[in-house]
C-alpha cells in the first residue's frame, strides 16, 4: 500500500504543471485542467500510477535488484543522493557522463581509478608526493567522486532507474532504453512520456514535490527489503 495521500501531494504542489504554452501534447491524458495559463495535473491518475510504479520497484528490490536514482539539476541533487543512500541504492546527482550505461566498460575503469585514489588518500601516499602532484591527484579524486561516487559500488548495470525530470535527463533515458533497463520517472506537462515505462505525472521543479517523491520511493524500497528479510527468516525457521 502506497504511503501517500492526495492531501500530501496538494500540499507539496505536485499538481502544478508548466505554463500551457510549454506543454507536450502526449501529456494530455494526465492533465486535469488549465488555470491561470498553467496546466493542472490530474492527481487521481498520479496516485494510481505512483502505486503501480512502487509495486514494480518493490518487486525489483525484493530480488536484490539495483536501482539507480538520477537527478542532476540543483533542485533534485541533494535529495537524490540522500534518498538513494537511505535505501542502500545508487545515484547520479552531479552530471550525467555520456555512456555511463552504454559504455559501462570504460566507466568501470574510471571507477577503478577513483578507488585507487581513495586508497592513496587514506594510506598516506598523497603525503609522500610533491605539493603539485598531491593537488593534481586530489582534484582528480574530487572530480571522479562527484561524477561516479554514487555508482562506485554498483558493480554493474542497474536493474531499473528512477528519474526526476525526463526533459533534463534525456541522455540517461536514451541509454536505459537502448539497453532495455526499465525507467520509472516523474513526468511534468512539458515532457514526453512515450519513452518511459512507468510514468508518474507530476511537478518536477518544486523542491517540496521532489522531496515527497523521493521519500516515498526510498521508503518503499527500504520497506520491501525489510519485509523480504522477515519472510526469509520465517521460511528458515519453518524449515528448521
From Swiss-Prot:
Key words of the record: Ribonucleoprotein, Ribosomal protein
Disulfide bonds: none
GO molecular function, one term: structural constituent of ribosome
Signal peptide: none
PROSITE patterns in the cross-refs: RIBOSOMAL_S2_1, RIBOSOMAL_S2_2
InterPro entries linked: Ribosomal_uS2, Ribosomal_uS2_bac/mit/plastid, Ribosomal_uS2_CS, Ribosomal_uS2_flav_dom_sf
This protein's GO CC annotations: cytosolic small ribosomal subunit
Any single GO BP term: translation
The family this protein is said to belong to: Belongs to the universal ribosomal protein uS2 family.
NCBIfam families, per database record: rpsB_bact
Protein name: Small ribosomal subunit protein uS2
